Amino acid sequence: MLFAFHSSAAMLISAAVTFLTGMVIMIQGSYFPVGIGLVIVSCIGFIMLLTSVPKLYKATLKRCHYDINGFSREQKNIAGRCAGKKKLDVLINLIFGLMAHEKLDESERLLMQISPLVDKSSNSYKMKYLFLNLALSGKRKDFQNCSYILERLINELQTSRELFILEKDEYRHLAEILQYETAFYSLDFGNLSASDKEIILKLNFLARQYLSYEHCTHELWNEYFKMHFNYMLGITYLTMGDNRSAQFYLNNTANTPYTYPETARAVYFFQTHDRKVFF
């Protein structure tokens, strides 16, 4: 890719030199036909550059932003040269990227690969590992496993001596949300009782409260939480029949750096009004 840019620069310089040489010869008048020929050739060169450089630029951008296979190879090479915490950081970053591109099988293999490393690491890495598993289970629509992982997260939040990435109040708040979310996934949405509706209202309230926090946590996880709770608000409003609010929050899941598959389901729902797509 770099060679292609260097070649384009060389072509541009050659075309410019040819154009100037042709103009000088034409002005002198001694070899006028040769001068015209050089000018025409240089103009053709300029036209070729004008058509090829934008394509090259777009191809480079596409490679930088969308080549998940190249990104994967690069991250694995870096991880191979690292150990301990640095290796885990690189692999966790890779798993996020793979999940964002729906490479779920490879994400699962890497999660299994880092499991022994996580067991020997600090509680913060155990939490990150659980959140990655939660995201993977959500993408696979395995809500039973989501509930199991949420229970483990609650236990970690309540027993961990580390503050992980959260302030103390936010820490407790998140644990409470996860408890209600676990209950939410077990509801029978076709036959909601009064107590079921209380769970939905409480989860809706807690998620809105969490999103109103002004202090900033670690950027990556803060964005993940914002995405997750926008989604929870969307589907709780959906169960309450407030489609307008549901659409607002579900659309917000598309305005984050990480792909959330529920956004596609949200778009489908608002086209078909089929609630079963969510549950």
Task: Please place each PLM-identified region on the residue numbering.
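Helix-turn-helix repeat elements of alpha-solenoid scaffolds
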Residues: 30-33, 59-76, 98-113, 140-159, ...
